[in-house]
Regions:
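Sec-dependent signal peptide recognition
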Residues: 1-7
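Extracytoplasmic low-complexity segments
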Residues: 15-110, 159, 166-169, 255, ...
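Short hydrophobic/aromatic patches on beta-strands that form ligand-binding or substrate-lining surfaces
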Residues: 34-37, 132-138, 231-233, 373, ...
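Acidic glycine-/aspartate-rich tracts in secreted/extracellular proteins
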Residues: 38-45, 139-142, 238, 249, ...
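Localized edge beta-strand/strand-to-loop motifs within extracellular or lumenal beta-rich domains
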Residues: 137, 227-243
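Beta-strand acidic-aromatic groove motif in beta-rich domains, primarily in extracellular
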Residues: 141-150, 241-243
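Glycan-recognition/cleft segments
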Residues: 146-205, 263-274
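Short, aromatic/His-centered strand-loop micro-motif at the edge of beta-sheets
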Residues: 187-232
Length: 421
């Protein structure tokens, strides 16, 4: 690997050919909206810009900012100097997201809302699909990698007591480094920009089956070269499936006993409330004030698997319990004389996750969120993901497994940085 890097660095023509081939592998993938490789800039030393389709009007230059300074009025300004360069990466360069120790300093790279609203990057509304791919080395953390995901600063928390600008959540789509499953590829989407299932947070998210390991960001070059992972999320608006992918593989992930989960217990309750609302009359456990648009009831018409848990014949009546596995849920069903008398949620599928809505469409008043890389606007102001990011790509359709595997193959042999940026 090291020999390959040295050879390419010493022969400009070979480097240019390898770099061009890799960029074309991304830009020729149908549906590309923007691709930042951290090599392409406005000018040497200028802002990073995106590769975009021919004829596109926007190159989505990335600004540097500290969202704590912008919204709390605290902390120093951020600059490109706060994102050290590795000098190598899947496309020749990578930026470092550091574990900042100053709680008033949370730097990120971003495209302001004013420059992206109603452009192809502003993926939203009926029938719209999205894929986000991030080539990264994860040092620590489980939070945001890239996307339009302004979490809002209107939550009543200790961290927001000194907020200078109170703003509602403006979430659309984003890719995270795991969240509830640290190190996984976690796709996150929202239909309302705000919260889900009466919880204060957005909870429509998926997690790849596999998770990325932690790798020290200051590891030796050979170790870093072997540590690139390809995080991805897809939302297919036709199937309503949100899927997390790590290194081109999605895998199956379920959450058993979701009622006991700190956050997804709210999704379990949304399933219950939606089921009870369909039964005439007020049922035990039913909340008549639960908003109908927050019910969570994936299709449960035809099970993919049925396991009989118990069969009993008593007092002339046949009682049977079945575990029915549907595509997105597992449900324990009780039947008496073949008539359903009870239904209990046993598990929720986390990958893929069923999302029955359209992506949030912000108002055209400037309040929508920016597209950010490395962090998102976050009321708790946590450090989040740390490590190296060597590329970010956004597509306006759900890429397939073969396409994502091809994009991951680009990370297996990193390139050195070009001689002049």
């Amino acid at each position: 690997m090291k020999r390959l890097l040295l050879c390419l660095a010493g022969v400009p023509g070979l480097y240019a050919d390898a770099y061009t081939e890799r960029v074309q592998a991304v830009t020729s993938t149908p549906g590309l909206v923007a691709f930042w490789d951290f090599t392409k800039r406005e000018a040497p030393g200028g802002r990073f810009t995106a590769h975009v389709p021919p004829g596109a009007k926007h190159d989505y230059a990335l600004d540097a900012g500290n969202y704590v300074k912008d919204l709390w009025g605290q902390g120093p300004a951020a600059s490109y100097a706060d994102f050290p360069l590795l000098g190598a990466g899947p496309f020749g360069e990578a930026i470092r997201i550091k574990a900042e120790t100053n709680p008033d300093f949370r730097p990120l790279l971003f495209v302001p809302r004013a420059r992206l609203h109603d452009t192809p990057l502003d993926i939203k509304g009926a029938g719209q699909a999205v894929t986000v791919v991030v080539w990264a080395i994860r040092e620590s953390g489980n939070h945001a990698l890239a996307g339009i995901w302004h979490e809002g600063t209107d939550l009543k928390e200790k961290s927001t007591e000194t907020i200078a600008k109170v703003e509602r959540g403006q979430r659309q789509y984003a890719l995270f480094a795991g969240l509830n499953k640290e190190g996984a590829a976690c796709g996150h989407v929202s239909e309302n920009g705000a919260s889900s299932f009466l919880n204060k947070y957005a909870l429509h998210k998926c997690n790849s089956a596999e998770a990325s390991p932690k790798v020290p960001a200051d590891a030796d070059p050979a170790s870093l070269a072997k540590s690139w992972r390809t995080f991805a999320m897809t939302f297919d608006s036709r199937t309503r499936e949100l899927t997390g992918w790590l290194d081109g593989a999605s895998g199956d992930r379920w959450l058993e006993n979701p009622q006991k989960d700190r956050l997804l217990s709210f999704a379990a309750n949304a399933w219950l409330q939606g089921r009870l609302a369909k039964i005439p009359g007020l049922q035990e456990g039913e909340d008549p004030k639960f908003p109908a648009d927050q019910y969570y009831n994936p299709p449960e018409e035809t099970p993919v698997k049925v396991t009989v848990l118990e069969e009993v014949l008593a007092e002339g009546r046949a009682r049977r319990e079945e575990l029915r596995e549907y595509r997105y849920t597992k449900v324990k069903v009780t039947l008496v004389d073949d008539r359903e008398t009870g239904r209990e949620l046993v598990a929720l599928r986390l990958n893929p996750w069923w999302f029955p809505h359209d992506l949030y469409t912000p108002k055209a008043d400037g309040t929508g969120g920016p597209f950010t890389i490395g962090r998102v606007i976050h009321s708790s102001r946590g450090v989040g993901f740390t490590g190296w990011i060597g590329g970010v790509a956004v597509f306006n359709r759900a890429l397939g497994a073969a396409e994502l595997a091809q994009l991951h193959a680009l990370a297996t042999a990193p390139l050195p940085a070009p001689a002049a940026k």
